[in-house]
Design a protein with these regions (language model features):
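C-terminal cap/linker of serine protease catalytic domains
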Residues: 21-28, 108, 132, 182, ...
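Active-site region of chymotrypsin-like
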Residues: 32-39, 103-112, 138-205, 209-210, ...
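Gly/Ser-enriched beta-turn/beta-hairpin loop segments
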Residues: 91-95, 147-164, 219-223, 235-251
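Protease-domain processing segments flanking chymotrypsin-fold serine proteases, especially trypsin-like
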Residues: 11, 16-45
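Conserved active-site neighborhood of the chymotrypsin/trypsin-like protease fold
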Residues: 42-45, 55-138, 163-164, 173, ...
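PDZ/PDZ-like groove recognition
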Residues: 220-276, 280-287, 291, 306-322, ...
């Protein structure tokens, strides 16, 4: 029997319609029960969630920048209004992650959340749970905008945050809050908003589940290779700086250089341009930072550098140092 064209069109349309992208009530309730608010020095700083390692040790996973110093202690508030003491157990400033120790007996009643194996693909719907705008835990939807690892300068660590991008609204106090997929697995931690000229750009910086899992399993202070300054693509420079560089120059200019940091000790000055690292040309910041983070902190590299007003390149020996050693 041949179906009329109109019916065939309707069947095709319905079969291609997107499925409901929301979370089930069961998942929302389970994630809310395992989510917490994090208070430092009596002030609400952001969110977090209960997680377990492979040995069933219980922690709270949150963002490191909620803490003013690693000596701070915290109070966590659960969905039922109870509060519990928590202390910093481990942290990773390169991914802005922190693990908090809590009483495992008291916290066991709230359950814990599993972590996904990897970053979801672009356009995948994911959901942020956190005390946005100082409210009770809200559920804010978003979509993965770029599943590749990006690096953004992060003032709280004076280093770079490795993250992926999520599109959607991102109010204050969402930091430390978890992002979950439709199965309720953690796919990342909220860290901040990429700012536009006026307010938020609508892009969130979210650390990967792989980085969170690594910290949970190691439960140690990370050693993230640091530069001791910030680097920028040369095409973002002011015209005055471009006019002092060789024509068609490519690389990353440095601004600022932090006093007594690795760049300063290597003799690199503000507005110097890093052209290559170990013979590999670097034009975008992720290219250089990926090379630096491919080796342990304390590793040596050779940069090729051009200074404003100079036409020649010079080799510079560079030694990275861990970001975490300067957080006191």
């Amino acid at each position: 029997m041949r179906l009329p064209c109109a019916i065939l069109f309707l069947i095709t349309l319905l079969s291609s319609a997107p499925a409901d992208e929301g979370l089930s009530k069961l998942i929302v309730n389970r994630v809310r029960e395992a989510s917490v608010e994090v208070l430092i020095q009596g002030q609400l700083r952001g969110g977090g969630a209960f997680v377990k390692d492979s040995r069933s040790r219980l922690f709270v996973l949150t963002a490191a920048h909620l803490f003013h110093t690693p000596r701070d202690t915290a109070i966590i508030a659960t969905h039922d209004g109870r509060t519990y003491f928590a202390s910093l157990s481990a942290y990773d400033l390169g991914h802005d992650l922190a693990l908090l120790e809590v009483d495992p007996v008291e916290a066991a009643q709230y359950g814990s959340l599993k972590l996904a194996a990897s970053i979801p693909n672009e356009t995948t719907p994911i959901f942020n749970f956190g005390p946005a705008l100082r409210r009770r835990t809200l559920v804010i939807p978003g979509h993965v905008a770029d599943a590749r690892i990006s690096y953004t300068d992060f003032t709280s660590s004076k280093g770079y945050l490795a993250h992926y991008f999520v599109s959607g609204i991102n109010p204050v106090m969402t930091s430390g809050g978890i992002w979950v997929n439709r199965s309720g697995e953690i796919v990342g931690i909220q860290h901040g908003r990429l700012l536009a000229e006026k307010g938020s750009s609508g892009l969130s910086m979210v650390s990967s589940p792989q980085a969170a899992t690594a910290l949970i399993e190691s439960n140690t202070i990370a050693r993230t290779p640091g530069l001791g300054g910030y680097i920028w693509e040369i095409w973002t420079a002011d015209r005055a700086l471009l006019d002092e560089l060789p024509r068609n120059a490519e690389g990353l200019f440095v601004n600022p250089v932090f006093e007594n940091g690795p760049l300063a000790r290597a003799g690199i000055k503000q507005f110097d341009v890093i052209v290559s690292c170990d013979g590999i040309p670097v034009r975008r910041r992720h290219e250089l930072l990926a090379i630096l983070r491919s080796k342990p902190a304390g590793s040596s590299f050779t940069f090729e550098v051009v200074s404003p007003g100079s036409q020649g390149r010079r080799p510079v020996a560079f030694l990275s140092e861990p970001l975490e050693q300067n957080w006191k």
